[in-house]
């Protein structure tokens, strides 16, 4: 039985809020057990996760999604299914690219040992789990000064970032930091080999080498993409993306809006500062007010290589120009919140909700004041515990990549 249900016909995401039909997630595996105090900054974590609790929290998140009838696709299951359906050449290419990209760089001796170890796995699932988790000298039964011969991919539970669903296509990303760049190996593999994904247009390829991550990519409606200029995504990349989209006749977007946000390492994407939760309701962190700046790319009249134009609008007017009516802006922790509450709930990704339908969102229970403010504004909040998951610096939107949504009427 496929990871996709019978309704899934391919990538179809033309909004942030349309009823969620199919979504990609990844429950953190053994890879998070290899995070050590000395490597927190390098591995992009704020603290070491208690892994049993983190997995329980993730299961709660997934259960809430499944309760709504959403087809929840686990990344490992998708990679396994793709691998089992792929040609011998595609399987060999995946393994060789994994070895090429491994961190630390493998010596000839270690490369041979890792390759033999992976090829000896009794199941595809075991092979994939080791590729994600990392491989130790104990696994290989070799002597080495290094304990980890291949580093883990501990951020992979943030499935939002390696690629983004954009209309009927995808952008597959070149990620800012080495620890995450390897994650797109799996994105390239599934979109090149899975029968239900292989014909998906690519609007961005990581080979283009300019940094962009999925937490910065938003589809506000059929006409408008919104992309963050952040700690992880550059304006230069968005300019290249605009050119690629303009050149692709399958893509119907008419406008890209780039939004400048604070360049903080712990709040690294647009979705940690501003999110769309309903047809006219947006959640934002007031901390970003003095940093917000907006550029327009005209994909209709901007020529073959549209350029960014500073539109000079305030946030409310910018959003009105996209949705066609006055937006409701909800600040983190609610109107009149103290600076302390704003900073605390911004820190724990208080804007980073996943909309499962217009005006229905899921996110961490710990951001109590923001949850209350959303409910007061007519948003239904589905809370789940995330005290451990949040230490990886992401909330429900970060931990999900919609693959299909119903269109918003």
Curated annotation (Swiss-Prot):
Enzyme active site: 398
Keyword terms of this UniProt record: Arginine metabolism, Cytoplasm, Hydrolase
UniProt-annotated location(s): Cytoplasm
GO molecular function, one term: arginine deiminase activity
Pfam family for this entry, one: ADI
Catalytic activity: L-arginine + H2O = L-citrulline + NH4(+)
GO cellular component: a single term: cytoplasm
Annotated pathway: Amino-acid degradation; L-arginine degradation via ADI pathway; carbamoyl phosphate from L-arginine: step 1/2
Transmembrane segments: none
GO BP of this protein: arginine catabolic process to ornithine; arginine deiminase pathway
Name of the top EC class for this enzyme: hydrolase
Its EC number(s): 3.5.3.6
PANTHER family cross-referenced by the UniProt entry: ARGININE DEIMINASE
Family: Belongs to the arginine deiminase family.
NCBIfam families: arcA (TIGR01078)
Protein name in the entry: Arginine deiminase
Source organism of this protein record: Metamycoplasma arthritidis (strain 158L3-1) (Mycoplasma arthritidis)
Lineage summary: Bacteria, Bacillati, Mycoplasmatota, Mycoplasmoidales, Metamycoplasmataceae
Gene it is expressed from: arcA
């Amino acid at each position: 039985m496929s990871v996709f249900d019978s309704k899934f016909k391919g990538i179809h995401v033309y909004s942030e809020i349309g009823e969620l039909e199919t979504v990609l997630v990844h429950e953190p595996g053994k890879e998070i057990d290899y995070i050590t105090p000395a490597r927190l900054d390098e591995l992009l974590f704020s603290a070491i996760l208690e892994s049993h609790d983190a997995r329980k929290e993730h299961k709660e998140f997934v259960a809430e999604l499944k309760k709504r009838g959403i087809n929840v696709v686990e990344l490992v299951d998708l990679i396994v299914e793709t691998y089992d359906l792929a040609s011998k050449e595609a399987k060999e290419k995946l393994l060789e690219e994994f070895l090429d990209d491994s961190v630390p760089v493998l010596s000839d001796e270690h490369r041979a040992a890792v390759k033999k170890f992976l090829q000896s796995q009794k199941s595809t699932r075991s092979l994939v789990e080791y590729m994600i988790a990392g491989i130790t000298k104990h696994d290989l039964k070799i002597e080495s000064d290094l304990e980890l011969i291949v580093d883990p991919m501990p951020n992979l539970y943030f499935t939002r970032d390696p690629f983004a669903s954009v209309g009927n296509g995808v952008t597959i990303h070149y990620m800012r930091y080495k620890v995450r760049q390897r994650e797109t190996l799996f994105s390239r593999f599934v979109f090149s080999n899975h029968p239900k994904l292989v014909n998906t247009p690519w609007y961005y390829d990581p080979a283009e080498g300019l940094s962009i991550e999925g937490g910065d990519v938003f589809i506000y409606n059929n006409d408008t993409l919104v992309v963050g200029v952040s700690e992880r995504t550059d304006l230069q990349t968005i300019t290249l993306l605009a050119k690629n989209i303009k050149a692709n006749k399958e893509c119907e977007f008419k406008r890209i809006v780039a939004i400048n946000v604070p360049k903080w390492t712990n709040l690294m994407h647009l979705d940690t500062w501003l999110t769309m939760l309903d047809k006219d309701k947006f959640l934002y962190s007031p901390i970003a007010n003095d940093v917000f700046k907006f550029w327009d790319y005209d994909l209709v009249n901007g020529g073959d290589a549209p350029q960014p134009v500073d539109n000079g609008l305030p946030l409310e007017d910018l959003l009105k120009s996209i949705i066609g009516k006055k937006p409701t802006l909800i600040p983190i922790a609610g109107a009149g919140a103290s600076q302390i509450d704003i900073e605390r709930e911004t820190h724990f990704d208080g804007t980073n909700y996943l909309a499962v339908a217009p005006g229905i969102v899921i996110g961490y229970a710990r951001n109590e004041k923001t949850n209350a403010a959303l409910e007061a504004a007519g948003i239904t909040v589905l809370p789940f515990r995330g005290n451990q998951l949040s230490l990886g610096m992401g909330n429900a939107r970060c931990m999900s990549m919609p693959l299909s949504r119903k269109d918003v009427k």
